[in-house]
């Protein structure tokens, strides 16, 4: 019998074969029909600051859990790209990274203001990023060394000695917080810039500077150690700082209140994560779901509590709502805001 004849199927046999095969296809789980998109791939998170600070620590903590929650279990790596208050990193994600979900940006939360104020070098539109969301609501506080005689913010206002504060650059939201305190609440201070918030804290340890404004979650370990004492905060609050005076409540100048409110809006996107524009919706759904699951992961929550880092998932939609609040300000308000907020 020829090979051709040997394997020839009659109509009845053919239908039986198709029925069996069709049932096999019908009842095969979808995930076995095609490999997950991220299988065998590497995701790079580009952090817009140097190693050691709050943004970097958050990204490295997420790195250890994202692989677990993304189908296909991709490798996740961190790349630090400090410079120009995260503008360099933001430009890279917007213009150079492929929209394939393999490059994620973790810039500072102040980048919307760099765009709002038309800062030189800005080559992005924050409203057109594919937003993943934010991993925290970050409250800002001003803290000074505990060995200094200042017990309250009123003590600082009455001080004859200039306060030397450390920061990572004028585009940092917490630095802008301190600048507005200087302009509208009479804080006598001078700012010195360092490569990262870790370097700022080292400078405080060495008594090179008197304190810093920073996110409360980043300051808390040093508050608990007794190194620094918090004296005033922004509008957003976290457990442990509820009793601190709020900058907006102390200001009598109407414009000052508006500017402080604008700045504090960015705290709702305290740890932003974005992908390049035009990243496919199905890929963005994977990333958003993974980030939301990571933040709820009991192991991550335990680690974040151990490291005294607050985590909270803020959805892409909520981030866009914050951006809408920032960008709908009248031109005259934005123009005057630019006198105080620099990059």
Where in this protein do the model-derived segments appear?
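An extracytoplasmic/periplasmic, membrane-proximal ligand-sensing/linker region
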Residues: 40, 225, 281-343
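Ligand-binding clamshell of periplasmic/extracellular solute-binding protein-like
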Residues: 62, 84-86, 101-113, 134-136, ...
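Short, polar/charged alpha-helical segment
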Residues: 52-72, 175-183, 222
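N-terminal secretory signal peptides
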Residues: 1-33
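Short, well-ordered beta-strand elements
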Residues: 41-50, 76-77, 104, 162-167
